[in-house]
Amino acid sequence: MEPFDHGWLDVGQGHRVYYEQCGNPQGKPALYLHGGPGSGCSPRQRRFFDPTVWRAVLFDQRGCGRSTPLGDTAHNHSDALIADIEALRRHLGIERWLVFGGSWGATLAATYAARNRDACSGVLLRGLFLGGRTDIDGFFHGAAALAPEAHEAFMQAIPARWRNRVVVWLDRVFSSGDSARIDRAVLAWRAWEHALGVWPERTVPADPTADEWPLLRARYRVQSHYLAHRCFIGEAKVMDAIARLHGLPVAFVHGTNDLICRPQNAWRAHRTLAGSRLAWAQGAGHDPFHPASLKLLGSALAAHARDGHFDAWPGEPS
């Protein structure tokens, strides 16, 4: 599916965000929010949407992907991203849209929807990340017992005195301007992500190509910036935002084997939010394109497109 429209929106403070619209120009509006933070959107993510049904909007958050300046962390925080989403909605003339995000994108989707309920027809959250210290520390250390060799290799790239404050060290490295240190950190972080299943299409990381290097440096610079500041939201505010979604159609999809975002995140959020639905992607990790995850996401989108809610979707009611 190719975009029928794309462009860059000037959101102020020196930032221009890339956006694209795919599918049916007269279809039901939906916004997809990518994860990371820092990852940017990819053509694969268009596959979530039935092109005959949805007018799907994807955009690269500040500093990510095709947005400019690439990798810029100035004026780059969660409140700015939420304002950008609203600016994009108004720019595109959309009254209400389904907001769909995965991982960090789910964090952002929930927070945006809580502040802009009237702009949302529903919320679909996949692999929920809560943005607190438990999640962040868990990402760097929680899976060490399951991938001990990969974790040891990752820790060897980090000075011993920083191994209990990995994200602070990474933020300093990516802000240092020292290209050699930055590139070593890119390779170490990327290898650890591969071990946890963030990059499912390749079991062993190939060396980055010349085209990939700038995007990887930007990705991890933005990600370290956000994680060092607990994504400028923190777990308590994310859970409060989820509680304030009461009355909106909300569905959660989470992989039972997710090593990046703990399954209990989805369970806690679901139990907090009366009327929400939760479905477990059996055997899936963090990869949204695992067959079990992809099937559930597709059925959730189809249910919302048909009914305007998730009540008849297979997920468990809260």
Model-assigned labels for residue ranges:
Residues 120-169:
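A catalytic-pocket lid/entrance helix-loop region that shapes and gates access to the active site
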Residues 95-134:
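Conserved hydrolase catalytic core segment
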Residues 11-69:
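Conserved HGGG/HGGXW glycine-rich cap/lid loop of the alpha/beta-hydrolase fold
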